[in-house]
Amino acid sequence: MAKKSLKIKQARTQKYSTREYSRCKICGRPHAYLRKFGVCRICFRELAYKGQIPGVRKASW
């Protein structure tokens, strides 16, 4: 889990656009962020298994 201070720091508008970075909307994790869904890989997996992300299912080939 991300520290509360880091979540607040990221939410503020930065002076320069290159300083902005994405965080997971659920847990606040900055790495392995999936832009299309707005969550990190761990939260994405949990939501997909619960069926809360429409159109996503486990792949098999």
Curated annotation (Swiss-Prot):
Its cofactor is Zn(2+). It comes from the Bacteria. It comes from Alkaliphilus metalliredigens (strain QYMF). Keywords: Metal-binding, Ribonucleoprotein, Ribosomal protein, RNA-binding, rRNA-binding, Zinc. Zn(2+) binds at C24, C27, C40, C43. GO terms for cellular component: cytoplasm; small ribosomal subunit. The lineage of its organism: Bacteria, Bacillati, Bacillota, Clostridia, Peptostreptococcales. Belongs to the universal ribosomal protein uS14 family. Zinc-binding uS14 subfamily. Binds 1 zinc ion per subunit. This is Small ribosomal subunit protein uS14. It holds the Pfam family Ribosomal_S14. Binds 16S rRNA, required for the assembly of 30S particles and may also be responsible for determining the conformation of the 16S rRNA at the A site. Part of the 30S ribosomal subunit. Contacts proteins S3 and S10. One of its GO terms (biological process) is translation. GO terms for molecular function: rRNA binding; structural constituent of ribosome; zinc ion binding. Disulfide bonds: none annotated. InterPro entries: Ribosomal_uS14, Ribosomal_uS14_bact, Ribosomal_uS14_CS, Ribosomal_uS14_sf.
